[in-house]
Amino acid sequence: MYSRLSRKYGIQIPPTVKIGYGLYIGHGIGIIINDSTVIGSNCNISQFLTIGSNRGTPAIIGDNVYIGPSVCIVENVRIGNNTTIGAGSVV
């Protein structure tokens, strides 16, 4: 499934990513998530999103988080519950 999503939609979410219940992907295209990322429950992610890098500690995203389009979340970041990250942000 990972390779099919990657090829067809440009979504790279490795099977090792920990994802809580109720993840919503709006306009799913151009999404890259590092393999050690943790995403809480009921999160909403938008297109052109990058989370993490190839080294260091993972990004941890809390519950009920909205991430707008064209956002870059780097490694070693903890995003709290009930947070909104606006379009084009670098965290």
Language-model regions, residue ranges each:
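Left-handed beta-helix
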Residues: 9, 15, 20-21, 26-35, ...
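Terminal amphipathic alpha-helical/low-complexity segments used for targeting or macromolecular assembly
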Residues: 1-10
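Leucine-rich solenoid repeat scaffolds
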Residues: 89-91
